[in-house]
Amino acid sequence: MTDKSIKELALSVGRPVEKLLEQVREAGLPQRTANDIITTEQQDTLVNHLKKIHGQESGAGKITLKRKTTSTAKVASTSGKAKTINVEVRKKHTFTKPNPEQIAAEAKARQETEERTRPQEQPRQAPQQQMRDESENKAQATLNAMRAAQQKETAKTTSTTTEVVVKRKSTNKPIKPVNVKQVETAEQRKAREAEAAKLKAVEETARRKAAEEAQQRTLEQMRKMASKYSTEETGATIRVIDDSPLAAGLVGQAYEDSFNQEDREIKRGGATNPRGQKKGGRNNQEEQSFKSHHKRGLKTSQANKHGFEKPVKKQVYDVEIGSTIVVADLAQKMAIKVREVIKTLMKMGELVTQNQSIDQDTAALVVEEMGHNPILVSDTQAEDNLLEAAEEARGEQTTRPPVVTIMGHVDHGKTSLLDRIRRSKVAAGEAGGITQHIGAYHVETDKGIITFLDTPGHAAFTAMRSRGAKATDIVVLVVAADDGVMPQTAEAIDHARAAGTPIIVAINKMDKESADPDRVLNELTTKQIVPEQWGGDVPVAMVSAHSGQGIDELLDLILIQSELMELKASGEGAAQGVVIEARVDKGRGAVTSILVQNGTLNIGDLVLAGSSYGRVRAMSDENGQPIKSAGPSIPVEILGLPDAPMAGDEVLVVNDEKKAREVADARADRERQKRIERQSAMRLENIMASMGKKDVPTVNVVLKADVRGTLEALTAALNELSMDEVRVRVISSGVGAITESDVTLAESSEAVLLGFNVRADTTARQKSDQDGIDIRYYSIIYELIDDVKNAMSGKLAPEHRETILGVAEVREVFHSSKFGAAAGCMVLEGMLHRNKPIRVLRDDVVVFQGELESLRRYKEVVEEVRAGMECGLAVKGYKDIKAKDKIEVYDVQLIKRSL
């Protein structure tokens, strides 16, 4: 690499100049513009920084191979026809070159282990080898004796045959003609054959007798060998006879030869009847059973004598039960079937399924009823153990900086006051000039170090203010001198009191002419906030964020209050803190803002936050500068968690990844169980409430926000907009950019897609343009809520408003052949219209409601008659009109409603 400018380096590596400048700043290099020169050493520093950020270390002995194969497969579709789909398989293998020093060390350790274990194995293997050798020698001697006996007995009978065969094989001369004198007679031949048969019978008897004696001797020797090596005198345990194939074969042969001819027939396939068929019925079944039994051999028959026996005494288990437990899990812990547990619950009056959860008390009664011992445990036992271990590992406590939360009503100058202290301009960067989420700032003043938490003042951010009050030591209540105590001011007072946090009042905007601090103090007194000037215990500072008036006095009050509280924490051991905010950044993943409360947080620590855990890959302060560690009362941003935790979750550094995974899984299970119970309860309530009612119009919303706290506040604000006539339903909510799946969900559920401080990616924009889905972006919470209100107003049914146009009194009633009863009337007020609806009133009571059939004046049909004029009219469908009745003409208008 050579020295080059930032612009040239960006072109060579294919990165945007702005992105490269940002990475250069993160690496701590001095270059700030595209024309600045970066040296070779600085380029190496930048590369090492990027590798460290992305979790990659330099390893020359590592290579990664990626393969991609494409194939097709046929699958059945819903129409019954097979369709072909493309299947792409991607494989990735990483090969690491072994280190020669490591290989040599492993070989040396393996050799030392073998040398240590060899002297120990030789004495242990010597008796077994000696026994095996003796067994093989005895078996070989027995086999040789049996063969010698058989050869000795049959030597006489086989010698003649062998000699004849040899002579026949060695004779090759032609056969001479037979002499007639040498031909024997028939009587001589019969005598010779009879003598040969007698000799053969004697030889057969002798041979059979010799074979039986040899077999008997072999059996006796094998029985002695089996008796010697098979079992001890007690017969309690079985020992292996021998491992040699020769001894095993001899014992097996002796065992087979111990059966008589009938048993051998049974073993070969059973006796046959005269027709050649096997005997059937029960006898044949017994023979087959006998055959299969004897095929197992000597070892199997001996082993079956010591098989498993069913225990007589019932096993009693210690069953651990949490706050809730699933019926199937409870049955598994007691080692019984699920139906038995369900039966017991039915006897107790509980109708449940195997996947349903029951409470701790009910589960304990079931366990006792089944005869086991219930042990009640806490669901947070593992978490408590981790906290106790972390507390024990901490060292001596020292004084720590105070954590101060600035609270108050919207637009009362909270962020501007904090800016004055920090000497920066943050409020101008907030959308709409209001704080949208909790901001954590670590400020080093001349008076000391103070950590400030800036909370939003809008009504929708109640949960954020509550979390800010719980995580703080001191609450600074900002009240505008020209506005006084407002609803969010009173709410902040309630949050501070609920958390037991001391309050310091800062009356802001004292530079305005309309400032009236006495009125503010009077209003605070009505909220039980009595200032020290009036004999109370609440410090009050008159400040102005614009001019800087009273800022030093406010800082003095904060530090004095922190000294009185004696705030201490340990800077050693595992870190413990709380999640201030969490968001998802594209390219960086989950970014979590943490306030460290105890211990020291370092890069590489294993962090457990809510139901997420992971190692800290990178850490930065509130200004985005990378740091390596953070002590108590210091806010930081970390990377490394797989997903964004909930704001307010407790953060703990653990050493054992297995325990961290167990605690995270347990928390996730509890959250999922609570969500399922809440949804089932809501469904049941909705079913009961909707019985007999019409469908209520609903505005479906898919919501995406930049941080968790803002998402929570927006969801709560939208749910509060629901009313009896129209409801708001948040179909899906999440943190991060709007994706294609969000657009698809909005299309399928006919929902409005809203993004707060986020944008849609390229795929999502293309999908929304194709499907005609409108994506709305917001940066101010007022605008988002107003648009949802307008959408709800469009779902409201219009209001029917009646306007009385005129009233006429019936003077005479005439009978007409065409209309029946016709009334002569005098218009008293307003105007009568022929095409408008009417009411007939008798003694100011409505007796008929309809329309006019005819309206005439001097026998001419007219459209309207004004007040003070006479007219004749006929009511359509009503003939019972009488004198002194009143005819009221009215009009109905549809008025569009709004929230």
Curated annotation (Swiss-Prot):
Residues 107-121 have a biased composition (Basic and acidic residues). Residues 508-511 are annotated as: G4. Residues 147-164 have a biased composition (Low complexity). It comes from the Bacteria. Residues 94-167, 259-309 are annotated as: Disordered. Residues 399-568 form the tr-type G domain. PANTHER family: TR-TYPE G DOMAIN-CONTAINING PROTEIN, TRANSLATION INITIATION FACTOR IF-2-RELATED. This is Translation initiation factor IF-2.
